[in-house]
Amino acid sequence: MKSYYIYTYGCQMNTADSERLSHQLESVGYTPTEDVETADLILLNTCAVRENAETKVYGRIGELMRLKRKNKNLILAVTGCMAQKNQAEMFKRAPHIDIVLGTHNIQHINEMIEEVQRGHTHQINVDMDNSVLPELEAKPNGTFYAWVPIMNGCNKFCTYCIVPHVRGREISRPVEAIVKEVTELGAKGFKEITLLGQNVNSYGLDFKDGTDFGTLVDALDGIPGIERIRYMTSHPQDMTKSMIDALGRSSNIVTHLHLPIQSGSDRILKKMNRHYTVEHYKELLSYCREKIKDVVVTTDIIVGFPGETEEDFQATLQLLKDVRYDMAYTFIYSKRSGTPAATMDDQVPEEVKRVRLQTLMDVQNEISYELNKPMEGQVFDIIVEGPSPRDEDMWFGRTSGNKMVLFPKDDSLSIGETVPSYIDKAQTWVCYGTIQKG
Protein backbone atom coordinates (compact mmCIF):
# COMPACT_ATOMS: atom_id res chain seq x y z
CA MET A 1 0.00 0.00 0.00
CA LYS A 2 1.43 3.40 -1.02
CA SER A 3 1.56 6.07 1.67
CA TYR A 4 1.81 9.86 1.65
CA TYR A 5 2.85 12.62 4.05
CA ILE A 6 1.92 16.30 3.66
CA TYR A 7 3.73 19.26 5.23
CA THR A 8 1.40 22.28 5.28
CA TYR A 9 2.81 25.78 5.74
CA GLY A 10 1.04 29.12 5.95
CA CYS A 11 -2.60 30.11 5.94
CA GLN A 12 -5.91 28.30 6.29
CA MET A 13 -6.34 28.30 2.50
CA ASN A 14 -3.29 26.06 2.29
CA THR A 15 -4.80 23.80 4.94
CA ALA A 16 -7.94 23.53 2.81
CA ASP A 17 -5.86 22.79 -0.28
CA SER A 18 -4.00 20.05 1.60
CA GLU A 19 -7.33 18.46 2.54
CA ARG A 20 -8.31 18.42 -1.13
CA LEU A 21 -4.94 16.98 -2.10
CA SER A 22 -5.41 14.25 0.51
CA HIS A 23 -8.73 13.23 -1.02
CA GLN A 24 -7.23 13.04 -4.51
CA LEU A 25 -4.29 10.94 -3.34
CA GLU A 26 -6.52 8.54 -1.43
CA SER A 27 -8.79 8.18 -4.46
CA VAL A 28 -5.93 6.40 -6.26
CA GLY A 29 -4.87 4.19 -3.39
CA TYR A 30 -2.54 6.28 -1.24
CA THR A 31 -2.98 6.14 2.54
CA PRO A 32 -1.80 8.80 5.01
CA THR A 33 1.13 8.07 7.29
CA GLU A 34 2.33 9.90 10.39
CA ASP A 35 5.89 8.70 9.79
CA VAL A 36 7.55 10.72 7.04
CA GLU A 37 10.42 8.22 7.00
CA THR A 38 8.15 5.54 5.51
CA ALA A 39 6.23 7.68 3.00
CA ASP A 40 6.23 6.88 -0.71
CA LEU A 41 5.13 10.43 -1.52
CA ILE A 42 6.07 13.57 0.41
CA LEU A 43 4.25 16.78 -0.50
CA LEU A 44 5.12 20.24 0.80
CA ASN A 45 2.26 22.76 0.54
CA THR A 46 4.12 26.03 0.85
CA CYS A 47 3.73 29.69 1.79
CA ALA A 48 5.44 32.74 0.27
CA VAL A 49 3.97 35.56 2.36
CA ARG A 50 7.20 36.08 4.31
CA GLU A 51 10.78 35.30 3.41
CA ASN A 52 11.34 33.23 6.57
CA ALA A 53 8.53 30.91 5.42
CA GLU A 54 10.49 30.15 2.24
CA THR A 55 13.68 29.64 4.24
CA LYS A 56 11.92 27.02 6.37
CA VAL A 57 10.65 25.17 3.31
CA TYR A 58 14.03 25.09 1.57
CA GLY A 59 15.55 23.84 4.81
CA ARG A 60 13.00 21.02 4.97
CA ILE A 61 13.55 20.15 1.30
CA GLY A 62 17.27 19.88 1.99
CA GLU A 63 16.64 17.54 4.91
CA LEU A 64 14.48 15.31 2.71
CA MET A 65 17.36 14.63 0.33
CA ARG A 66 18.47 11.95 2.82
CA LEU A 67 15.19 10.07 2.32
CA LYS A 68 15.44 10.38 -1.47
CA ARG A 69 18.87 8.74 -1.32
CA LYS A 70 17.53 5.96 0.86
CA ASN A 71 14.44 5.32 -1.29
CA LYS A 72 14.97 5.87 -5.01
CA ASN A 73 11.20 5.53 -5.63
CA LEU A 74 10.25 8.29 -3.18
CA ILE A 75 8.38 11.12 -4.92
CA LEU A 76 8.90 14.66 -3.61
CA ALA A 77 6.32 17.27 -4.64
CA VAL A 78 6.09 20.98 -3.85
CA THR A 79 2.90 23.01 -4.26
CA GLY A 80 1.41 26.22 -2.90
CA CYS A 81 2.39 29.88 -3.16
CA MET A 82 6.15 29.34 -3.00
CA ALA A 83 5.94 26.84 -5.87
CA GLN A 84 3.93 29.35 -7.90
CA LYS A 85 6.36 32.18 -7.14
CA ASN A 86 9.66 30.37 -7.70
CA GLN A 87 8.53 27.83 -10.32
CA ALA A 88 11.37 26.13 -12.26
CA GLU A 89 13.96 27.83 -10.04
CA MET A 90 13.05 25.22 -7.44
CA PHE A 91 14.50 22.42 -9.58
CA LYS A 92 17.76 24.35 -9.90
CA ARG A 93 17.98 24.93 -6.16
CA ALA A 94 16.81 21.43 -5.20
CA PRO A 95 17.20 18.96 -8.11
CA HIS A 96 15.80 16.10 -6.02
CA ILE A 97 12.31 17.65 -6.24
CA ASP A 98 10.14 15.66 -8.68
CA ILE A 99 7.01 17.82 -8.98
CA VAL A 100 6.32 21.57 -8.80
CA LEU A 101 2.59 22.33 -8.75
CA GLY A 102 1.12 25.85 -8.80
CA THR A 103 -1.76 27.28 -6.79
CA HIS A 104 -4.27 26.67 -9.62
CA ASN A 105 -3.20 23.13 -10.43
CA ILE A 106 -3.68 20.83 -7.45
CA GLN A 107 -6.31 18.88 -9.40
CA HIS A 108 -3.46 17.54 -11.56
CA ILE A 109 -1.44 15.92 -8.76
CA ASN A 110 -2.30 12.31 -9.64
CA GLU A 111 -1.48 12.59 -13.35
CA MET A 112 1.85 14.25 -12.50
CA ILE A 113 2.68 11.43 -10.09
CA GLU A 114 2.00 8.96 -12.91
CA GLU A 115 4.42 10.82 -15.17
CA VAL A 116 7.15 10.66 -12.53
CA GLN A 117 6.53 6.94 -12.07
CA ARG A 118 7.03 6.52 -15.83
CA GLY A 119 10.47 8.06 -15.43
CA HIS A 120 9.59 11.61 -16.50
CA THR A 121 10.87 13.54 -13.49
CA HIS A 122 10.88 17.32 -12.95
CA GLN A 123 7.17 17.69 -13.70
CA ILE A 124 5.90 21.28 -13.47
CA ASN A 125 2.46 22.86 -13.87
CA VAL A 126 2.11 26.47 -12.77
CA ASP A 127 -0.47 27.69 -15.30
CA MET A 128 -2.82 30.28 -13.81
CA ASP A 129 -6.18 29.72 -15.49
CA ASN A 130 -8.65 32.14 -13.92
CA SER A 131 -11.58 31.02 -16.06
CA VAL A 132 -12.75 28.26 -13.75
CA LEU A 133 -12.26 27.08 -10.17
CA PRO A 134 -12.37 23.26 -10.15
CA GLU A 135 -14.69 21.57 -7.70
CA LEU A 136 -12.56 19.23 -5.59
CA GLU A 137 -13.75 17.04 -2.75
CA ALA A 138 -11.89 17.35 0.55
CA LYS A 139 -10.90 15.06 3.38
CA PRO A 140 -11.37 17.30 6.46
CA ASN A 141 -8.81 16.81 9.21
CA GLY A 142 -11.13 18.14 11.90
CA THR A 143 -13.76 16.12 13.70
CA PHE A 144 -16.39 18.85 14.02
CA TYR A 145 -15.06 21.74 11.93
CA ALA A 146 -14.14 22.10 8.27
CA TRP A 147 -12.59 24.66 5.94
CA VAL A 148 -14.67 25.65 2.91
CA PRO A 149 -12.95 27.76 0.24
CA ILE A 150 -15.46 30.05 -1.47
CA MET A 151 -13.04 31.75 -3.87
CA ASN A 152 -9.42 32.00 -4.89
CA GLY A 153 -7.14 34.92 -5.69
CA CYS A 154 -7.08 38.62 -4.88
CA ASN A 155 -7.46 41.77 -6.98
CA LYS A 156 -6.30 44.26 -4.37
CA PHE A 157 -2.51 44.46 -4.89
CA CYS A 158 -1.62 45.89 -1.50
CA THR A 159 1.94 47.13 -1.95
CA TYR A 160 3.36 44.85 0.76
CA CYS A 161 1.63 41.63 -0.33
CA ILE A 162 2.73 38.86 -2.69
CA VAL A 163 -0.62 37.01 -2.69
CA PRO A 164 -2.15 38.44 -5.91
CA HIS A 165 1.03 37.47 -7.76
CA VAL A 166 0.88 33.84 -6.61
CA ARG A 167 -2.86 33.23 -6.21
CA GLY A 168 -3.97 35.15 -9.29
CA ARG A 169 -7.12 37.17 -9.88
CA GLU A 170 -10.32 36.61 -7.93
CA ILE A 171 -12.55 33.75 -9.01
CA SER A 172 -15.58 32.61 -7.03
CA ARG A 173 -17.23 29.23 -6.61
CA PRO A 174 -20.94 29.12 -7.47
CA VAL A 175 -23.32 29.61 -4.54
CA GLU A 176 -24.95 26.26 -5.32
CA ALA A 177 -21.64 24.39 -5.08
CA ILE A 178 -20.83 25.92 -1.70
CA VAL A 179 -24.32 25.23 -0.34
CA LYS A 180 -24.01 21.62 -1.52
CA GLU A 181 -20.64 21.15 0.21
CA VAL A 182 -21.81 22.74 3.47
CA THR A 183 -25.04 20.70 3.44
CA GLU A 184 -23.02 17.49 3.02
CA LEU A 185 -20.70 18.51 5.85
CA GLY A 186 -23.69 19.13 8.12
CA ALA A 187 -25.09 15.70 7.26
CA LYS A 188 -21.73 14.12 8.16
CA GLY A 189 -21.75 15.67 11.63
CA PHE A 190 -19.62 18.76 11.09
CA LYS A 191 -21.09 21.62 13.10
CA GLU A 192 -18.64 24.48 12.44
CA ILE A 193 -17.29 25.63 9.09
CA THR A 194 -15.04 28.49 8.05
CA LEU A 195 -15.61 30.17 4.70
CA LEU A 196 -12.23 30.99 3.17
CA GLY A 197 -11.10 33.61 0.71
CA GLN A 198 -8.27 36.10 0.43
CA ASN A 199 -11.06 38.70 0.48
CA VAL A 200 -14.47 37.20 1.19
CA ASN A 201 -16.14 40.59 0.81
CA SER A 202 -15.42 40.54 -2.93
CA TYR A 203 -17.01 37.10 -3.29
CA GLY A 204 -19.28 36.89 -6.34
CA LEU A 205 -18.21 40.15 -7.96
CA ASP A 206 -16.76 38.18 -10.88
CA PHE A 207 -20.24 36.76 -11.62
CA LYS A 208 -21.45 40.28 -12.51
CA ASP A 209 -25.05 39.36 -11.68
CA GLY A 210 -25.51 41.03 -8.29
CA THR A 211 -24.32 38.01 -6.28
CA ASP A 212 -22.17 39.02 -3.32
CA PHE A 213 -21.04 37.73 0.06
CA GLY A 214 -24.39 38.66 1.59
CA THR A 215 -26.12 36.46 -1.00
CA LEU A 216 -23.98 33.52 0.10
CA VAL A 217 -24.55 34.18 3.81
CA ASP A 218 -28.32 34.15 3.24
CA ALA A 219 -28.08 30.93 1.20
CA LEU A 220 -26.19 29.16 4.00
CA ASP A 221 -28.56 30.24 6.76
CA GLY A 222 -30.32 27.38 8.53
CA ILE A 223 -28.50 24.44 6.93
CA PRO A 224 -29.19 21.44 9.23
CA GLY A 225 -26.37 20.54 11.59
CA ILE A 226 -24.31 23.67 10.99
CA GLU A 227 -24.23 25.62 14.26
CA ARG A 228 -21.48 28.09 13.45
CA ILE A 229 -20.16 29.66 10.27
CA ARG A 230 -16.93 31.61 10.49
CA TYR A 231 -15.39 33.53 7.60
CA MET A 232 -12.05 35.06 6.72
CA THR A 233 -10.59 37.35 5.60
CA SER A 234 -12.61 40.55 5.16
CA HIS A 235 -11.46 43.70 3.37
CA PRO A 236 -12.98 47.07 4.34
CA GLN A 237 -13.05 48.35 0.76
CA ASP A 238 -15.57 45.75 -0.38
CA MET A 239 -17.63 45.40 2.80
CA THR A 240 -21.10 46.89 2.32
CA LYS A 241 -24.02 47.65 4.60
CA SER A 242 -26.12 45.01 2.84
CA MET A 243 -23.47 42.38 3.64
CA ILE A 244 -23.41 43.52 7.26
CA ASP A 245 -27.22 43.27 7.34
CA ALA A 246 -26.96 39.66 6.12
CA LEU A 247 -24.37 38.84 8.80
CA GLY A 248 -26.61 40.37 11.44
CA ARG A 249 -29.76 38.43 10.51
CA SER A 250 -28.07 35.04 10.01
CA SER A 251 -28.85 32.34 12.57
CA ASN A 252 -25.49 30.58 12.26
CA ILE A 253 -22.90 33.24 11.37
CA VAL A 254 -20.65 33.76 14.39
CA THR A 255 -20.35 37.05 16.26
CA HIS A 256 -16.61 37.28 15.49
CA LEU A 257 -15.63 39.84 12.85
CA HIS A 258 -11.99 40.04 11.75
CA LEU A 259 -11.58 43.30 9.83
CA PRO A 260 -7.94 44.24 9.12
CA ILE A 261 -7.15 47.96 9.31
CA GLN A 262 -3.32 47.64 8.86
CA SER A 263 -2.66 51.27 9.87
CA GLY A 264 -4.41 54.16 11.60
CA SER A 265 -2.83 56.69 9.24
CA ASP A 266 -4.57 57.64 6.00
CA ARG A 267 -1.19 58.52 4.49
CA ILE A 268 0.18 55.05 5.17
CA LEU A 269 -3.05 53.36 4.05
CA LYS A 270 -2.65 55.15 0.71
CA LYS A 271 0.97 53.97 0.42
CA MET A 272 -0.26 50.45 1.19
CA ASN A 273 -2.86 50.77 -1.62
CA ARG A 274 -5.67 49.80 0.76
CA HIS A 275 -8.36 51.98 -0.93
CA TYR A 276 -10.15 53.19 2.21
CA THR A 277 -9.72 55.86 4.86
CA VAL A 278 -9.73 55.56 8.62
CA GLU A 279 -13.00 57.48 8.72
CA HIS A 280 -14.68 55.08 6.28
CA TYR A 281 -13.39 52.13 8.28
CA LYS A 282 -14.80 53.56 11.51
CA GLU A 283 -18.19 54.12 9.87
CA LEU A 284 -18.27 50.49 8.71
CA LEU A 285 -17.34 49.26 12.16
CA SER A 286 -19.98 51.42 13.80
CA TYR A 287 -22.61 49.89 11.50
CA CYS A 288 -21.34 46.39 12.30
CA ARG A 289 -21.69 47.04 16.01
CA GLU A 290 -25.20 48.32 15.44
CA LYS A 291 -26.38 45.36 13.33
CA ILE A 292 -24.43 42.35 14.70
CA LYS A 293 -25.42 41.62 18.28
CA ASP A 294 -22.47 41.12 20.68
CA VAL A 295 -19.99 41.42 17.83
CA VAL A 296 -16.35 40.71 18.74
CA VAL A 297 -13.96 42.67 16.54
CA THR A 298 -10.33 41.78 15.81
CA THR A 299 -7.88 43.25 13.33
CA ASP A 300 -4.42 43.11 11.72
CA ILE A 301 -1.90 45.94 12.06
CA ILE A 302 1.51 46.37 10.43
CA VAL A 303 4.03 48.63 12.15
CA GLY A 304 7.12 50.08 10.51
CA PHE A 305 5.77 50.25 6.97
CA PRO A 306 8.16 52.26 4.73
CA GLY A 307 7.80 55.96 5.45
CA GLU A 308 5.84 55.48 8.68
CA THR A 309 6.63 58.49 10.87
CA GLU A 310 6.11 58.87 14.59
CA GLU A 311 2.99 60.88 13.77
CA ASP A 312 1.65 58.01 11.64
CA PHE A 313 2.35 55.55 14.42
CA GLN A 314 0.63 57.73 17.01
CA ALA A 315 -2.43 57.80 14.73
CA THR A 316 -2.48 54.00 14.84
CA LEU A 317 -2.25 54.03 18.63
CA GLN A 318 -5.13 56.50 18.76
CA LEU A 319 -7.17 54.25 16.48
CA LEU A 320 -6.73 51.37 18.93
CA LYS A 321 -7.98 53.56 21.77
CA ASP A 322 -10.93 54.83 19.73
CA VAL A 323 -12.05 51.52 18.19
CA ARG A 324 -11.14 49.21 21.11
CA TYR A 325 -10.54 45.90 19.38
CA ASP A 326 -11.00 42.68 21.31
CA MET A 327 -7.68 41.56 19.85
CA ALA A 328 -5.16 42.81 17.30
CA TYR A 329 -2.72 40.63 15.39
CA THR A 330 0.31 42.89 15.10
CA PHE A 331 3.23 42.46 12.73
CA ILE A 332 6.52 44.17 12.01
CA TYR A 333 6.76 45.08 8.33
CA SER A 334 9.24 42.88 6.51
CA LYS A 335 10.32 43.31 2.91
CA ARG A 336 8.92 40.89 0.37
CA SER A 337 10.78 40.75 -2.92
CA GLY A 338 8.50 41.32 -5.88
CA THR A 339 6.28 43.83 -4.07
CA PRO A 340 6.38 47.64 -4.52
CA ALA A 341 6.92 48.28 -0.81
CA ALA A 342 10.22 46.40 -0.85
CA THR A 343 11.81 49.12 -3.00
CA MET A 344 10.19 52.14 -1.34
CA ASP A 345 12.37 54.83 0.19
CA ASP A 346 12.37 55.59 3.93
CA GLN A 347 12.57 52.03 5.20
CA VAL A 348 12.06 52.17 8.98
CA PRO A 349 15.00 50.96 11.13
CA GLU A 350 14.48 47.55 12.75
CA GLU A 351 14.94 48.89 16.28
CA VAL A 352 12.25 51.53 15.72
CA LYS A 353 9.92 48.82 14.42
CA ARG A 354 10.49 46.67 17.50
CA VAL A 355 9.84 49.54 19.90
CA ARG A 356 6.65 50.50 18.07
CA LEU A 357 5.43 46.91 18.05
CA GLN A 358 5.91 46.58 21.80
CA THR A 359 4.18 49.90 22.45
CA LEU A 360 1.26 48.81 20.27
CA MET A 361 0.99 45.45 22.02
CA ASP A 362 1.05 47.08 25.46
CA VAL A 363 -1.87 49.34 24.54
CA GLN A 364 -3.86 46.53 22.91
CA ASN A 365 -3.26 44.06 25.74
CA GLU A 366 -4.75 46.51 28.21
CA ILE A 367 -7.80 47.00 26.00
CA SER A 368 -8.22 43.24 25.49
CA TYR A 369 -8.19 42.65 29.23
CA GLU A 370 -10.70 45.45 29.84
CA LEU A 371 -13.08 43.95 27.26
CA ASN A 372 -12.70 40.40 28.57
CA LYS A 373 -13.16 41.28 32.24
CA PRO A 374 -16.97 41.82 32.01
CA MET A 375 -17.30 38.21 30.78
CA GLU A 376 -16.69 37.05 34.36
CA GLY A 377 -19.89 35.75 35.92
CA GLN A 378 -21.57 35.19 32.55
CA VAL A 379 -22.36 31.94 30.73
CA PHE A 380 -21.29 31.37 27.12
CA ASP A 381 -21.83 28.41 24.83
CA ILE A 382 -18.54 26.90 23.71
CA ILE A 383 -17.67 24.04 21.38
CA VAL A 384 -15.21 21.66 23.04
CA GLU A 385 -12.02 21.46 20.96
CA GLY A 386 -9.94 19.15 23.16
CA PRO A 387 -6.90 19.25 25.46
CA SER A 388 -5.01 22.48 25.97
CA PRO A 389 -1.60 22.36 24.23
CA ARG A 390 0.00 23.82 27.37
CA ASP A 391 -1.72 21.90 30.16
CA GLU A 392 -2.92 18.31 29.82
CA ASP A 393 -5.25 18.76 32.79
CA MET A 394 -7.16 21.53 31.00
CA TRP A 395 -9.40 21.43 27.95
CA PHE A 396 -10.53 24.34 25.84
CA GLY A 397 -13.31 25.57 23.62
CA ARG A 398 -14.31 28.79 21.88
CA THR A 399 -17.27 31.10 22.07
CA SER A 400 -19.10 32.32 19.00
CA GLY A 401 -16.96 35.45 19.31
CA ASN A 402 -13.81 33.27 19.13
CA LYS A 403 -12.84 33.85 22.77
CA MET A 404 -10.84 30.88 24.07
CA VAL A 405 -12.17 29.33 27.29
CA LEU A 406 -10.06 26.88 29.34
CA PHE A 407 -11.77 24.49 31.74
CA PRO A 408 -10.76 21.43 33.82
CA LYS A 409 -10.49 18.19 31.85
CA ASP A 410 -13.80 16.33 31.82
CA ASP A 411 -13.89 12.82 30.34
CA SER A 412 -17.67 12.93 30.13
CA LEU A 413 -17.41 15.54 27.36
CA SER A 414 -16.77 14.85 23.69
CA ILE A 415 -14.76 16.90 21.24
CA GLY A 416 -17.22 18.89 19.18
CA GLU A 417 -19.85 18.98 21.92
CA THR A 418 -21.55 22.32 22.54
CA VAL A 419 -21.74 23.12 26.25
CA PRO A 420 -22.43 26.17 28.42
CA SER A 421 -19.45 27.50 30.36
CA TYR A 422 -19.57 29.84 33.33
CA ILE A 423 -16.65 32.29 33.14
CA ASP A 424 -14.80 32.31 36.46
CA LYS A 425 -11.83 34.44 35.45
CA ALA A 426 -10.95 36.50 32.39
CA GLN A 427 -7.44 37.35 31.28
CA THR A 428 -5.97 39.18 28.31
CA TRP A 429 -5.84 36.23 25.92
CA VAL A 430 -7.99 33.52 27.51
CA CYS A 431 -10.82 32.97 29.97
CA TYR A 432 -11.15 30.24 32.59
CA GLY A 433 -14.52 28.61 33.01
CA THR A 434 -16.59 25.89 34.61
CA ILE A 435 -18.84 23.70 32.46
CA GLN A 436 -22.50 23.95 33.44
CA LYS A 437 -24.22 20.57 33.48
CA GLY A 438 -27.81 19.51 33.80
Q: What kind of feature is each model-predicted range?
A:
Residues 13, 49-52, 82, 236-238, ...:
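Glycine-/small-residue-rich active-site loops that bind phosphorylated ligands and cofactors
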Residues 158, 178, 195, 231, ...:
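Conserved, mostly hydrophobic/aromatic
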Residues 76-78, 85, 187-310, 321:
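Conserved SAM/AdoMet-binding glycine-rich loop
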Residues 11, 204-221, 225, 272, ...:
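Radical SAM enzyme [4Fe-4S]-AdoMet core and its adjacent flexible, acidic
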Residues 107, 156, 201, 237, ...:
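Glycine-centered loop/turn positions within well-structured domains
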Residues 141-144, 154-156, 253, 263, ...:
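Short flexible coil/turn linkers enriched for glycine and charged/polar residues
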Residues 1-203, 242, 257, 279-290, ...:
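Proteins enriched for Cys/Gly/acidic motifs involved in redox and nucleic-acid/cofactor modification
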Residues 343-438:
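Terminal RNA-binding accessory module
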